[in-house]
Amino acid sequence: RNEKLQQLFEIEQYTEMALHYMRLGSETNDFVLRKVSLDDVIKEAVHKYARQFIRKKIALSYEAVETVVTTDEKWLEFVLEQLLSNALKYTPSGSIAICVEDGRLVITDTGIGIKQEDLPRVCEKGYTGYNGHADRRSTGIGLYLCSSILKKLGHTLSITSEEGQGTRVVIGFPQD
């Protein structure tokens, strides 16, 4: 039963990714920029992946934040879901931490990390790198979508990683 639920969840994720990919490519996108509680967006994304955290026994480190950012709530939530999905996929055991540092959202995992030669290309459309080749479920679309969406929202994306030690993803928001 749990395996079937997991497969259903993954199908839902791929469908959602395809829909966001198509919407992002259209001439008119449905961005609605407004002041949003970052805490609310984070909690929604984490809630969606709660089962995966429990199933994989991955510890989540997160404390509520008071940060308000100007963004599109729906699109930012999709980005966070993609980043959590990647962190969970490539963290066989250990933890994932979410925090805010100097107004930027930081997601850090203790996963397998990304090879240094792959790092500059991880946001290219279709690029899966070494880790993606090892995991046949990898599409090479997730980080491309994250990068493209954040760029359109006027946010920044920075990824650093040490192979075998984990990955750190930082989303920067323009200061109002």
Regions found by a protein language model. Give the residues of each.
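A conserved beta-strand-to-alpha-helix junction within the catalytic ATP-binding
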Residues: 32-50, 61
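Short beta-strand/loop element within the Bergerat-fold HATPase_c
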Residues: 93-104
